[in-house]
Curated annotation (Swiss-Prot):
Domain of life of the native organism: Bacteria
Organism name: Renibacterium salmoninarum (strain ATCC 33209 / DSM 20767 / JCM 11484 / NBRC 15589 / NCIMB 2235)
InterPro entries: rRNA_ssu_MeTfrase_G, SAM-dependent_MTases_sf
A family per Pfam: GidB
Molecular-function GO terms, alphabetical: rRNA (guanine-N7-)-methyltransferase activity
Residues that hold S-adenosyl-L-methionine according to the record: G73, L78, A125, E126, R140
Entry-linked HAMAP family: 16SrRNA_methyltr_G
GO cellular component: cytosol
Protein encoded by which gene: rsmG
PANTHER family in alphabetical order: S-ADENOSYL-L-METHIONINE-DEPENDENT METHYLTRANSFERASES SUPERFAMILY PROTEIN
Keywords for this protein: Cytoplasm, Methyltransferase, rRNA processing, S-adenosyl-L-methionine, Transferase
UniProt-annotated location(s): Cytoplasm
Protein name in the entry: Ribosomal RNA small subunit methyltransferase G
Amino acid sequence: MLEMTEAVASAAHSVFGDRLPLAQRYVEHLATSGIERGLIGPREVPRLWDRHVLNCAVVVELIEIDATVADVGSGAGLPGLCLALARPDLSITLIEPLERRVTWLSEVVADLGLSDQVTLFRMRAEQAVDEVNCSVVTARAVSALDKLAGLTIPLLHGNGQFLAVKGRSAAEEITKAAKAVRKLGGTRTDVLVAGSSVLEEPTTVVRILVGSAHR
């Protein structure tokens, strides 16, 4: 089991609660088979908890109760599986086009006992529009916001929110994507911070509201 600092352990307990053992098991998958099968780089192991898993999981602060969530470009389950672990009330669909990643995700979902909560689609986001019914779309490290908006906003079918985990370039990306977002039906775009009460470095999230979805 990967060791955690006291601060990270406290944050993990706060975020995952009684599902912390499952989160720990997920991190072990990332640190072993996730590396062996090319889903995550070996240099990321020392910071799996704070830089990746907790960084993603705190986004649940921005998601309403009992929401249906589609995670685009799920890769190693970041942020989709982290959200599922942190919030048992959420219904999560992982959308990932690469077969080897979907195979790994399927194995991990089964091992964690999340099959009733998490569904996997092996397809591109554009192909999932007619397959997915969701109120929230999430993505992390997929592409720049202007391109990403075109892949994700259509999944909301005119109403909901898109949450993109971003870094310091968030404001600049919003400016570049403004025209595309408006054309796609985005009604408001904000830069929000999640996890400020539990993380030393909170997560920056770009939120795009679509239709009547206002918080």
